Protein backbone atom coordinates (compact mmCIF):
# COMPACT_ATOMS: atom_id res chain seq x y z
CA UNK A 1 0.00 0.00 0.00
CA UNK A 2 0.92 3.67 0.26
CA UNK A 3 2.83 3.09 3.51
CA UNK A 4 5.06 0.49 1.89
CA UNK A 5 5.70 2.79 -1.09
CA UNK A 6 6.63 5.62 1.29
CA UNK A 7 9.03 3.31 3.16
CA UNK A 8 10.73 2.36 -0.09
CA UNK A 9 10.95 5.97 -1.23
CA UNK A 10 12.48 6.99 2.11
CA UNK A 11 15.00 4.15 1.90
CA UNK A 12 15.94 5.05 -1.67
CA UNK A 13 16.36 8.72 -0.75
CA UNK A 14 18.58 7.76 2.19
CA UNK A 15 20.72 5.48 0.00
CA UNK A 16 20.88 7.83 -2.99
CA UNK A 17 24.45 8.37 -4.18
CA UNK A 18 26.04 11.78 -3.77
CA UNK A 19 27.19 12.94 -7.18
CA UNK A 20 29.36 15.98 -7.76
CA UNK A 21 27.65 19.19 -8.97
CA UNK A 22 28.93 18.79 -12.55
CA UNK A 23 27.50 15.28 -12.80
CA UNK A 24 24.18 16.39 -11.32
CA UNK A 25 23.99 19.25 -13.82
CA UNK A 26 24.74 16.88 -16.70
CA UNK A 27 22.08 14.41 -15.59
CA UNK A 28 19.52 17.14 -15.01
CA UNK A 29 20.13 18.51 -18.49
CA UNK A 30 19.84 15.03 -20.03
CA UNK A 31 16.57 14.44 -18.19
CA UNK A 32 15.17 17.79 -19.31
CA UNK A 33 16.15 17.14 -22.94
CA UNK A 34 14.56 13.70 -22.79
CA UNK A 35 11.32 15.10 -21.41
CA UNK A 36 11.34 17.76 -24.14
CA UNK A 37 10.82 15.02 -26.75
CA UNK A 38 7.59 13.95 -25.07
CA UNK A 39 6.63 17.54 -24.25
CA UNK A 40 6.69 18.54 -27.91
CA UNK A 41 6.08 15.36 -29.89
CA UNK A 42 3.13 13.84 -28.03
CA UNK A 43 0.85 16.85 -28.62
CA UNK A 44 2.03 16.79 -32.25
CA UNK A 45 0.60 13.27 -32.62
CA UNK A 46 -2.87 14.68 -31.95
CA UNK A 47 -4.01 11.56 -30.08
CA UNK A 48 -2.16 11.76 -26.76
CA UNK A 49 0.26 8.97 -27.68
CA UNK A 50 4.03 9.17 -28.28
CA UNK A 51 5.40 8.85 -31.82
CA UNK A 52 8.02 6.14 -32.18
CA UNK A 53 10.85 8.57 -32.92
CA UNK A 54 11.87 11.93 -34.33
CA UNK A 55 14.52 11.85 -37.07
CA UNK A 56 16.19 15.16 -37.89
CA UNK A 57 19.12 14.16 -40.14
CA UNK A 58 18.36 12.97 -42.75
CA UNK A 59 15.12 14.82 -42.20
CA UNK A 60 12.25 12.37 -41.82
CA UNK A 61 10.26 14.07 -39.06
CA UNK A 62 8.02 12.19 -36.66
CA UNK A 63 7.50 8.47 -37.15
CA UNK A 64 3.72 8.40 -36.76
CA UNK A 65 3.46 4.98 -35.19
CA UNK A 66 3.68 3.78 -31.62
CA UNK A 67 3.96 0.62 -29.52
CA UNK A 68 2.92 -0.59 -26.05
CA UNK A 69 6.46 -0.05 -24.77
CA UNK A 70 6.57 3.49 -26.19
CA UNK A 71 3.28 4.25 -24.47
CA UNK A 72 4.42 2.76 -21.17
CA UNK A 73 7.59 4.81 -21.16
CA UNK A 74 5.62 7.96 -21.96
CA UNK A 75 3.39 7.41 -18.93
CA UNK A 76 6.45 6.85 -16.75
CA UNK A 77 8.08 9.95 -18.27
CA UNK A 78 5.05 12.01 -17.19
CA UNK A 79 5.47 10.79 -13.61
CA UNK A 80 9.24 11.35 -13.73
CA UNK A 81 8.82 14.87 -15.14
CA UNK A 82 6.51 15.67 -12.23
CA UNK A 83 8.94 14.13 -9.74
CA UNK A 84 11.81 16.20 -11.18
CA UNK A 85 9.79 19.42 -11.12
CA UNK A 86 9.59 19.88 -14.89
CA UNK A 87 5.77 19.93 -14.80
CA UNK A 88 3.02 20.34 -12.18
CA UNK A 89 0.34 17.87 -11.15
CA UNK A 90 -2.24 19.37 -13.49
CA UNK A 91 -0.12 18.83 -16.62
CA UNK A 92 0.90 15.32 -15.60
CA UNK A 93 -2.72 14.33 -15.00
CA UNK A 94 -3.93 15.99 -18.21
CA UNK A 95 -1.34 14.09 -20.25
CA UNK A 96 -2.08 10.76 -18.59
CA UNK A 97 -5.84 11.22 -19.02
CA UNK A 98 -5.37 12.08 -22.70
CA UNK A 99 -3.23 9.00 -23.18
CA UNK A 100 -5.81 6.80 -21.44
CA UNK A 101 -8.69 8.27 -23.47
CA UNK A 102 -7.02 6.88 -26.58
CA UNK A 103 -5.71 3.66 -25.06
CA UNK A 104 -9.13 2.59 -23.86
CA UNK A 105 -10.57 2.71 -27.39
CA UNK A 106 -7.74 1.03 -29.30
CA UNK A 107 -8.39 -2.36 -30.88
CA UNK A 108 -6.91 -5.08 -28.66
CA UNK A 109 -6.42 -8.84 -28.44
CA UNK A 110 -7.42 -10.38 -25.08
CA UNK A 111 -7.05 -6.93 -23.54
CA UNK A 112 -3.50 -6.53 -24.86
CA UNK A 113 -2.31 -3.94 -27.34
CA UNK A 114 -0.80 -4.95 -30.65
CA UNK A 115 2.88 -4.30 -31.27
CA UNK A 116 2.20 -1.22 -33.37
CA UNK A 117 -0.48 1.35 -34.23
CA UNK A 118 -0.74 3.98 -36.95
CA UNK A 119 -1.12 7.30 -35.12
CA UNK A 120 -3.00 8.83 -38.04
CA UNK A 121 -5.78 6.23 -38.01
CA UNK A 122 -5.23 4.40 -34.68
CA UNK A 123 -5.49 1.14 -36.63
CA UNK A 124 -3.13 -1.71 -35.68
CA UNK A 125 -0.16 -2.08 -37.99
CA UNK A 126 -0.27 -5.16 -40.20
CA UNK A 127 0.40 -7.97 -39.73
CA UNK A 128 -1.26 -7.77 -36.32
CA UNK A 129 0.98 -9.25 -33.64
CA UNK A 130 0.95 -9.23 -29.84
CA UNK A 131 4.34 -9.15 -28.10
CA UNK A 132 4.58 -10.65 -24.61
CA UNK A 133 7.44 -8.37 -23.56
CA UNK A 134 5.59 -5.29 -24.87
CA UNK A 135 2.58 -6.26 -22.79
CA UNK A 136 4.72 -6.78 -19.70
CA UNK A 137 6.31 -3.36 -20.12
CA UNK A 138 2.95 -1.65 -20.46
CA UNK A 139 1.42 -3.47 -17.48
CA UNK A 140 4.41 -2.44 -15.36
CA UNK A 141 4.03 1.19 -16.42
CA UNK A 142 0.28 1.21 -15.78
CA UNK A 143 0.70 -0.21 -12.28
CA UNK A 144 3.51 2.21 -11.43
CA UNK A 145 1.55 5.25 -12.61
CA UNK A 146 -1.67 4.08 -10.94
CA UNK A 147 0.12 4.19 -7.60
CA UNK A 148 1.88 7.46 -8.36
CA UNK A 149 -1.34 9.38 -9.12
CA UNK A 150 -3.60 7.67 -6.58
CA UNK A 151 -3.64 10.61 -4.15
CA UNK A 152 -4.03 13.27 -6.85
CA UNK A 153 -6.67 11.55 -9.01
CA UNK A 154 -8.30 8.37 -7.70
CA UNK A 155 -10.45 7.99 -10.82
CA UNK A 156 -7.44 8.08 -13.15
CA UNK A 157 -5.62 5.64 -10.88
CA UNK A 158 -8.53 3.23 -11.16
CA UNK A 159 -8.58 3.55 -14.97
CA UNK A 160 -4.88 2.71 -15.12
CA UNK A 161 -5.38 -0.28 -12.82
CA UNK A 162 -8.37 -1.55 -14.80
CA UNK A 163 -6.50 -1.41 -18.11
CA UNK A 164 -3.62 -3.36 -16.57
CA UNK A 165 -5.97 -5.92 -15.01
CA UNK A 166 -7.73 -6.44 -18.34
CA UNK A 167 -4.53 -7.45 -20.14
CA UNK A 168 -4.65 -11.26 -20.23
CA UNK A 169 -0.96 -12.09 -19.99
CA UNK A 170 -1.95 -15.68 -19.22
CA UNK A 171 -3.14 -16.00 -22.82
CA UNK A 172 0.54 -15.99 -23.88
CA UNK A 173 1.66 -18.47 -21.22
CA UNK A 174 2.67 -22.00 -22.21
CA UNK A 175 1.53 -24.13 -19.26
CA UNK A 176 3.39 -27.20 -20.55
CA UNK A 177 6.78 -25.46 -20.53
CA UNK A 178 5.94 -22.90 -17.83
CA UNK A 179 7.30 -20.14 -20.06
CA UNK A 180 5.86 -17.23 -22.02
CA UNK A 181 5.63 -17.41 -25.78
CA UNK A 182 7.45 -14.57 -27.56
CA UNK A 183 4.09 -13.47 -28.88
CA UNK A 184 0.93 -14.19 -30.82
CA UNK A 185 0.56 -13.93 -34.60
CA UNK A 186 -3.04 -12.77 -34.67
CA UNK A 187 -3.24 -12.78 -38.47
CA UNK A 188 -2.09 -16.40 -38.65
CA UNK A 189 -3.88 -17.45 -35.47
CA UNK A 190 -0.83 -19.09 -33.91
CA UNK A 191 1.56 -18.60 -31.00
CA UNK A 192 5.27 -18.18 -31.66
CA UNK A 193 7.24 -21.41 -31.45
CA UNK A 194 9.91 -19.62 -29.39
CA UNK A 195 9.71 -18.67 -25.71
CA UNK A 196 11.29 -16.22 -23.31
CA UNK A 197 13.37 -18.64 -21.26
CA UNK A 198 16.30 -16.57 -19.91
CA UNK A 199 16.53 -14.74 -16.59
CA UNK A 200 18.96 -12.22 -18.14
CA UNK A 201 16.33 -10.72 -20.39
CA UNK A 202 14.17 -7.63 -20.75
CA UNK A 203 11.25 -10.08 -20.32
CA UNK A 204 12.11 -10.44 -16.61
CA UNK A 205 9.59 -7.69 -15.89
CA UNK A 206 6.88 -9.60 -17.79
CA UNK A 207 7.52 -12.66 -15.62
CA UNK A 208 7.46 -10.61 -12.42
CA UNK A 209 4.22 -8.72 -13.07
CA UNK A 210 2.46 -11.83 -14.39
CA UNK A 211 3.28 -13.73 -11.20
CA UNK A 212 2.35 -10.71 -9.08
CA UNK A 213 -1.06 -10.48 -10.78
CA UNK A 214 -1.70 -14.22 -10.50
CA UNK A 215 -1.49 -14.67 -14.28
CA UNK A 216 1.48 -17.05 -14.09
CA UNK A 217 2.44 -19.52 -11.34
CA UNK A 218 5.36 -18.83 -9.02
CA UNK A 219 7.20 -21.86 -10.44
CA UNK A 220 7.58 -19.94 -13.71
CA UNK A 221 10.30 -17.82 -12.08
CA UNK A 222 12.38 -20.93 -11.46
CA UNK A 223 11.96 -22.04 -15.07
CA UNK A 224 13.93 -19.04 -16.33
CA UNK A 225 17.37 -20.34 -17.31
CA UNK A 226 20.41 -18.88 -15.53
CA UNK A 227 23.52 -20.04 -17.45
CA UNK A 228 26.61 -18.56 -15.74
CA UNK A 229 29.70 -17.50 -17.66
CA UNK A 230 32.94 -15.59 -17.17
CA UNK A 231 33.87 -12.49 -19.15
CA UNK A 232 37.43 -11.26 -18.61
CA UNK A 233 37.47 -12.60 -15.07
CA UNK A 234 34.04 -11.29 -14.03
CA UNK A 235 31.07 -13.65 -13.92
CA UNK A 236 27.55 -12.91 -15.09
CA UNK A 237 24.58 -14.74 -16.55
CA UNK A 238 24.34 -15.24 -20.28
CA UNK A 239 21.75 -13.21 -22.18
CA UNK A 240 20.60 -13.78 -25.74
CA UNK A 241 22.32 -10.75 -27.33
CA UNK A 242 24.73 -9.46 -24.66
CA UNK A 243 23.03 -6.04 -24.54
CA UNK A 244 22.88 -3.64 -21.60
CA UNK A 245 19.13 -3.48 -22.25
CA UNK A 246 18.60 -7.14 -21.34
CA UNK A 247 20.45 -6.85 -18.04
CA UNK A 248 19.31 -3.44 -16.84
CA UNK A 249 15.99 -2.40 -18.39
CA UNK A 250 13.79 -4.25 -15.82
CA UNK A 251 15.54 -2.22 -13.10
CA UNK A 252 13.37 0.76 -14.05
CA UNK A 253 10.43 -0.99 -12.37
CA UNK A 254 12.05 -3.54 -10.07
CA UNK A 255 15.51 -2.43 -8.87
CA UNK A 256 17.46 -5.46 -7.73
CA UNK A 257 18.44 -5.52 -4.02
CA UNK A 258 22.11 -5.65 -3.12
CA UNK A 259 23.81 -9.03 -2.66
CA UNK A 260 21.38 -10.88 -4.90
CA UNK A 261 21.85 -12.89 -8.07
CA UNK A 262 20.28 -10.09 -10.12
CA UNK A 263 22.69 -7.41 -8.89
CA UNK A 264 25.75 -9.65 -9.24
CA UNK A 265 24.64 -10.52 -12.77
CA UNK A 266 24.28 -6.84 -13.62
CA UNK A 267 27.64 -5.90 -12.12
CA UNK A 268 29.35 -8.66 -14.09
CA UNK A 269 27.74 -7.51 -17.33
CA UNK A 270 28.69 -3.89 -16.64
CA UNK A 271 32.25 -4.90 -15.80
CA UNK A 272 32.53 -6.76 -19.11
CA UNK A 273 31.24 -3.68 -20.98
CA UNK A 274 33.74 -1.41 -19.23
CA UNK A 275 36.68 -3.75 -19.90
CA UNK A 276 35.70 -3.94 -23.56
CA UNK A 277 35.52 -0.14 -23.80
CA UNK A 278 38.91 0.36 -22.10
CA UNK A 279 40.58 -1.99 -24.58
CA UNK A 280 39.20 0.02 -27.49
CA UNK A 281 39.52 3.46 -25.88
CA UNK A 282 35.86 4.39 -26.24
CA UNK A 283 32.81 4.92 -24.01
CA UNK A 284 30.94 1.81 -22.85
CA UNK A 285 27.28 0.93 -23.31
CA UNK A 286 26.70 -1.53 -26.14
CA UNK A 287 22.97 -2.20 -26.46
CA UNK A 288 20.15 -2.43 -28.95
CA UNK A 289 19.66 0.85 -30.75
CA UNK A 290 19.31 2.70 -34.00
CA UNK A 291 22.45 2.81 -36.11
CA UNK A 292 23.98 4.22 -39.28
CA UNK A 293 22.12 2.19 -41.90
CA UNK A 294 19.02 3.20 -43.82
CA UNK A 295 15.96 1.79 -45.56
CA UNK A 296 14.82 3.07 -48.94
CA UNK A 297 13.08 6.01 -47.21
CA UNK A 298 16.32 7.03 -45.42
CA UNK A 299 15.04 5.94 -42.01
CA UNK A 300 17.71 4.74 -39.61
CA UNK A 301 17.65 1.01 -38.91
CA UNK A 302 17.44 -0.67 -35.50
CA UNK A 303 18.97 -3.86 -34.14
CA UNK A 304 20.51 -5.46 -31.05
CA UNK A 305 24.21 -4.76 -30.48
CA UNK A 306 25.90 -6.66 -27.70
CA UNK A 307 29.06 -8.26 -26.36
CA UNK A 308 29.69 -11.64 -27.94
CA UNK A 309 31.25 -13.02 -24.73
CA UNK A 310 27.99 -12.43 -22.83
CA UNK A 311 25.64 -13.62 -25.59
CA UNK A 312 24.16 -16.98 -26.49
CA UNK A 313 23.38 -15.73 -30.00
CA UNK A 314 26.39 -15.93 -32.32
CA UNK A 315 25.16 -13.17 -34.65
CA UNK A 316 25.91 -10.15 -32.46
CA UNK A 317 28.17 -7.17 -32.95
CA UNK A 318 29.58 -4.58 -30.54
CA UNK A 319 29.84 -1.96 -33.26
CA UNK A 320 27.49 0.63 -31.71
CA UNK A 321 27.47 2.34 -28.30
CA UNK A 322 24.04 3.56 -27.15
CA UNK A 323 24.06 6.57 -24.77
CA UNK A 324 20.83 5.45 -23.07
CA UNK A 325 22.69 2.40 -21.71
CA UNK A 326 24.58 4.73 -19.35
CA UNK A 327 21.27 6.03 -18.02
CA UNK A 328 20.14 2.46 -17.34
CA UNK A 329 23.34 1.93 -15.33
CA UNK A 330 22.88 4.99 -13.09
CA UNK A 331 21.41 3.07 -10.16
CA UNK A 332 24.06 0.36 -10.37
CA UNK A 333 27.13 2.58 -10.86
CA UNK A 334 26.15 6.28 -10.68
CA UNK A 335 29.65 7.77 -10.75
CA UNK A 336 30.84 5.57 -13.61
CA UNK A 337 27.66 6.21 -15.59
CA UNK A 338 27.91 9.98 -15.11
CA UNK A 339 31.58 9.96 -16.15
CA UNK A 340 30.74 7.91 -19.23
CA UNK A 341 28.01 10.38 -20.20
CA UNK A 342 30.40 13.30 -19.66
CA UNK A 343 32.89 11.66 -21.99
CA UNK A 344 30.22 11.21 -24.64
CA UNK A 345 29.41 14.90 -24.32
CA UNK A 346 33.10 15.75 -24.79
CA UNK A 347 33.10 13.64 -27.96
CA UNK A 348 30.20 15.68 -29.33
CA UNK A 349 27.52 13.03 -28.91
CA UNK A 350 24.98 15.33 -27.25
CA UNK A 351 21.99 15.79 -29.55
Set out the residue ranges of the language-model regions.
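Ser/Thr/Asn(+Pro)-rich, low-complexity disordered segments
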Residues: 1-8, 13-351
Amino acid sequence: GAGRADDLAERDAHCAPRLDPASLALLSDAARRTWHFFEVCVPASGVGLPPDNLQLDPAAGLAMRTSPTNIGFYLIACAAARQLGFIRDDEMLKRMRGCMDTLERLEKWRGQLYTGYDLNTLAPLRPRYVSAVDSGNLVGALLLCAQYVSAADAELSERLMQLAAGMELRALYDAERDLFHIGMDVEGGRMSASHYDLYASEARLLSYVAIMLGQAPVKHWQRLSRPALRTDGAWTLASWSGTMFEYLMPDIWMPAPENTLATEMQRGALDAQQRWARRLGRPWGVSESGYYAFDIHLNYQYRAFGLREAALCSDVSAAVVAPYASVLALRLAPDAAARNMARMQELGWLG
